[in-house]
């Protein structure tokens, strides 16, 4: 029997309440104990970029692995569980392990750990920029690495990618996403004389973690993984960041960004200017 691929729309309907719940319960800036209804109204419409990002990553994973795939999965930099929990829901036969920096506020919270356990996910603490991943070689059949690359100090990039390569088994998958250095937004910022990066100062919410200190293009990521014995399976570029523009939900600037995103979805020639790239690599056997 042929299994129909998941529709993006159906995945979005599943992941949105998961993301909303994770942010409400574990977010660094969320009011402790806030009711679900109150929080939903507070962030109404603001989670669209995350919902779109996670839904696309889930669809790419399903396309590359199939719905009945088995084995060990690893997420580097699990954050509040935005991606980890949906991956566990849509890939129930994969045993997921999450790696997170142990200084994050939610890392030792019993509620956070219990939520991961309820989804059959294990949590491991590791400062990935300075410590080897605490796993044997070739352990994982799939590894997700979303919105983490851009936070890495440049001098530690090769160390982290070498560790990623080490723990993925031959034939295994790396599913990654990161802001696109060559996006239209970044080009416009540079033309205005503005920087596209944050200063490399540690984040106040966790020791030895950083904001966006280096962005990469899809071609750079391809080169970085090719020299480590990976082949590109698929690459998608997409913009979903109009939600973040201006304060008013109906502002003119925000409307222009939304119109551009709609145009980008319909004109393939514009997609190379997308805000975020999504790439799937397979480790050569």
What are the functions of these language-model segments?
Residues 80-92:
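Conserved SAM-binding loop of SAM-dependent methyltransferases across substrates and taxa
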Residues 95-100:
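Conserved SAM-binding motif I beta-strand of class I
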Residues 93-94, 172:
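A short helix->loop->beta-strand "cap" motif at the edges of active sites that frequently abuts
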Residues 131-143:
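A short acidic, Gly/Pro-enriched loop at the edge of an enzyme's catalytic core
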Residues 69-79:
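Conserved class I S-adenosyl-L-methionine
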Residues 49-69:
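Conserved alpha-helix/loop element of class I SAM-dependent methyltransferases that forms part
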Residues 145-148:
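A short beta-strand submotif of the Rossmann-like class I SAM-dependent methyltransferase core
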Residues 4-54, 82, 101, 106, ...:
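S-adenosyl-L-methionine-dependent methyltransferase catalytic module, highlighting the catalytic core
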